Structure formats: structure tokens, C-alpha cells
């Protein structure tokens, strides 16, 4: 549903601070939304997402799993449902947070399908502990980030750096 943003360098803007407006970063969207927030997946990734949401004063409204993983079970006191049942409960205008990663082609295709049909995010999370890569962290470390960016001289490397930065800020899988 959300569209990929392009870095405004082509328009003459070269300051990385302008790569993505604060209100379009994943943690700001989640902090201020009134839409239901649901987790796709359980386990360690789900635990980490719940912890990250708590840092911004939010809790998930529900959780669903792929059809093969839906059993009579709960995750953090929430019933684990199918996507169809979750959609019946919350409607299509929900925010889906992916709580796991995969390199399995069928799973990746399902994630692309979810991204095309819903507000779908896969936020970067601290592996062990530490700060969220949110807008405040980004601005606090902008000098180091800009210095690293300046080390790349070819456009392909710079574009990749921008895409990684856009992913880290937006949580969008299109990057």
C-alpha cells in the first residue's frame, strides 16, 4: 500500500537528514496510528516486536500466523489466528508487522503479497538489546552516517546505502 520513496538527491538535496520525513518512519507511524497493529508471526521476533512497541507506548492488537502454523494456541495472551480471521476481526485497514525473516521463496512471495495488499512493515530490531533505529537515533548519529555515506564514490554503492537507510527508517521491504 505504501509507496517506495526516492532519495531527493536528484532534486539537488544531498543532506541525508532529508531522506525520509520523520512522520513517515515506521516507529512514528506506529506511535501515532489509530489503526489496529497486528503481528505476523510469533517466537523470538514477536517477543522483540512487543518489547519495541512497548518502548513507544503501544501494544499489538492481535497476532496471526501462516495457515500451517495456526493451532489452538496463544502468544502473549493473544489467540494466534489466521490472516483471514484477523482480517474479519480488524478489517483490511490494519498495520501488519512481520515478526520473522525468511529466505524461503514461497514465504518471501507471501510477504510481497502482504506488502502489496496491506500496510506491511518489517521493522529492524536490535538483535540483543540496544536502541531502536528510529528517527531520534538517526538524527543523533547523522554525522557518523553521513561520513560513512561520503566514503562511497560510485552511485551504485551510494544508492544501496540510501536503500539500507530507507529500510532501517521505514521498515518497508521494498528497499
What name fits each language-model region?
Residues 1-175:
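Hydrophobic, well-ordered beta-alpha structural blocks that scaffold small-molecule cofactor pockets
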Amino acid at each position: 500500500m505504501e509507496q517506495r520513496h526516492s532519495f531527493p538527491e536528484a532534486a539537488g538535496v544531498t543532506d541525508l537528514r532529508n531522506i525520509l520525513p520523520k512522520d513517515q518512519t515506521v516507529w512514528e507511524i506506529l506511535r501515532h496510528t489509530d489503526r489496529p497493529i497486528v503481528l505476523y508471526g510469533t517466537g523470538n521476533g514477536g517477543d522483540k516486536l512487543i518489547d519495541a512497541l512497548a518502548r513507544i507506548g503501544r501494544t499489538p492488537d492481535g497476532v496471526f500466523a501462516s495457515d500451517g502454523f495456526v493451532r489452538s494456541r496463544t502468544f502473549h495472551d493473544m489467540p494466534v489466528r489466521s490472516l483471514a480471521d484477523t482480517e474479519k476481526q480488524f478489517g483490511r485497514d490494519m498495520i501488519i508487522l512481520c515478526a520473522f525473516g525468511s529466505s524461503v521463496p514461497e514465504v518471501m512471495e507471501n510477504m510481497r503479497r502482504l506488502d502489496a495488499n496491506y500496510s506491511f512493515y518489517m521493522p529492524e530490531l536490535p538483535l540483543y538489546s540496544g536502541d531502536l533505529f528510529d528517527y531520534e537515533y538517526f538524527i543523533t548519529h547523522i554525522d557518523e552516517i553521513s561520513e560513512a555515506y561520503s566514503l562511497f564514490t560510485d552511485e551504485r554503492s551510494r544508492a544501496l546505502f540510501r536503500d539500507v537507510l530507507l529500510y532501517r527508517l521505514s521498515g518497508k521491504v521494498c528497499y
